[in-house]
């Protein structure tokens, strides 16, 4: 089996995390997984949704979108169509669930964190790149809140989180699929994990033949290997 990119089966794409990419948001990152590029921002606003009023905890919610020409052919903006597509809704819910799992909401205080992930160039793995980049932006936003005198109850961050894709390509488990692999893979799996080694979400779909238990275990092992490398990259970015 030869991957289109020439990478080894267990090799990540080149990953770059650029902090403070925009000047207005409390946290902002440009994350690059190979040719996939996503701008992730975290904005802080006072108050919480109505269903959390008086409960003494904060909230985090996420939105996701793709620029019209982030792909090979221009896609119509969802705003001009008047509604979000099912894929968009699924991905932004995944991003929100994943990031909320990193936080103790009772320590946030009466604030809402708005996470925005905008894909400026897509080459596979946009949802996993969004989660990985948004986590770093979230850390920067929390630092800003603390500097402003917030987080009196302590640090709400329980652990780092990151995400990566794995799949079965030409009968072999591979790590971090780009678009040519993703479009031809027999199985596509998106994995979200904590830096403590726990799983937050595993999304898997067979595109044709079912995958076997040994395939699933091989893909999870690759995801864990890749995730350890990604956590190191996140920490290195935050140390700059």
Curated annotation (Swiss-Prot):
Phosphate binds at residues 87, 125-127. The keyword tRNA-binding applies. Keywords: Nucleotidyltransferase, RNA-binding, rRNA processing, Transferase, tRNA processing, tRNA-binding. It comes from the Bacteria. It is an enzyme of class 2 (transferase). GO terms for molecular function: 3'-5'-RNA exonuclease activity; tRNA binding; tRNA nucleotidyltransferase activity. GO terms for biological process: rRNA catabolic process; rRNA processing; tRNA processing. InterPro entries: ExoRNase_PH_dom1, ExoRNase_PH_dom2, ExoRNase_PH_dom2_sf, PNPase/RNase_PH_dom_sf, Ribosomal_Su5_D2-typ_SF, RNase_PH, RNase_PH_bac-type, RNase_PH_CS. It catalyses: tRNA(n+1) + phosphate = tRNA(n) + a ribonucleoside 5'-diphosphate. Pfam families: RNase_PH (PF01138), RNase_PH_C (PF03725). The keyword Cytoplasm does not apply. Its EC number is 2.7.7.56. PANTHER family: EXOSOME COMPLEX COMPONENT, EXOSOME COMPLEX COMPONENT RRP41. Homohexameric ring arranged as a trimer of dimers. Belongs to the RNase PH family. Phosphorolytic 3'-5' exoribonuclease that plays an important role in tRNA 3'-end maturation. Removes nucleotide residues following the 3'-CCA terminus of tRNAs; can also add nucleotides to the ends of RNA molecules by using nucleoside diphosphates as substrates, but this may not be physiologically important. Probably plays a role in initiation of 16S rRNA degradation (leading to ribosome degradation) during starvation. This is Ribonuclease PH. The lineage of its organism: Bacteria, Pseudomonadati, Pseudomonadota, Gammaproteobacteria, Pseudomonadales.
